Amino acid sequence: MKVYCLLVVLLVGLVSQTQGQLDKKCNMACTLDYRPVCGSDGKTYPNRCALTSTACESQQSITVLHDGEC
């Protein structure tokens, strides 16, 4: 039982640390400049930074299809 509890504590710590690293990596300071781009997910983003930030946070591969709205 002690071993099980120890494994649970270690697993929770590992998940928390991994999420913290992801949050730091994706924490981008994007400007409010409106230079729309069309993402490969079919959504219009206000600028390239916003697209990159969304892709990082959602852990998806979203690329710029073209400048301008979709």
Swiss-Prot record:
Subcellular localization: Secreted
Disulfide bonding pattern of the chain: 26-56, 30-49, 38-70
Feature type site, description Reactive bond: 32-33
First and last residue of the signal peptide: 1-20
Domain Kazal-like: 21-70
InterPro entries: Kazal_dom, Kazal_dom_sf, Prot_inh_Kazal-m, Prot_Inhib_GrowthFact_Antg
GO cellular component: extracellular region
Tissue: Expressed by the venom duct.
GO terms for MF: ion channel regulator activity; serine-type endopeptidase inhibitor activity; toxin activity
UniProt KW keywords: Disulfide bond, Ion channel impairing toxin, Neurotoxin, Protease inhibitor, Secreted, Serine protease inhibitor, Signal, Toxin
Entry's Gene Ontology BP terms: cell differentiation
Main location: secreted
Family the UniProt entry places it in: Belongs to the conopeptide P-like superfamily.
Role according to the record: Acts as a neurotoxin by inhibiting an ion channel. May also act as a serine protease inhibitor, since it possess the kazal serine protease inhibitor signature.
Domain notes: The cysteine framework is IX (C-C-C-C-C-C).
Protein name per the record: Turripeptide Pal9.2
Origin species: Polystira albida (White giant-turris)
